[in-house]
Amino acid sequence: MRPPQLPEQPVGVVRAEHLTRLLRTYEGRDFTSRRDSAIILLLVDTGMRRAECVGMTLDDLDLDQRIVWVLGKGRRPRALPIGRKTAQALDRYLRVRDEHRLSHLPHLWVGRNGPMTPSGIYQVVHDRARAAGLPAMHPHQLRHAFATSWLAEGGNENELMLVAGWKSRIMVDRYTKATAVERARASHARLPPADRL
């Protein structure tokens, strides 16, 4: 006897306007604002996992080439491209980090008492979402936002697998299903059959 098949859980999608509101909560020039802004932008821009984010060191950044290195699941290293805004946010964070009392640590992300933990990254996203008046949000939702945006904008599925660090197509298929309705709607808007009659 086989267990019953459970329905596949749809991938929750963070709306673009929510991401914009989330990023607007970082207007300050203080250490925490600069750090949190860089974390959020990095998560949104790369889709990295929070464990990958928290595991980064200063040596994992190449801001001139706009590439960051992460150690993914199975301890597989990956190079992730970043955009101009993310590189700028990281540069601003590094400048205030240099003045932090824990600047001697090799860890990229530091807090009051030491290197940040996965729960610290979770707290950054959760607290900033609350400050923006948004529904509860967690770091993995930013990974979802990255993947769905990549596909919705016509990004290559094989490249997404590489950047996201997935070994199988199962995850790509989940995200493809999540964006299928939006992609069909956009295609129909470009090619409405009845409008050509």
Model-derived segments and spans:
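Conserved catalytic core of the tyrosine transesterase superfamily
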Residues: M1-L197
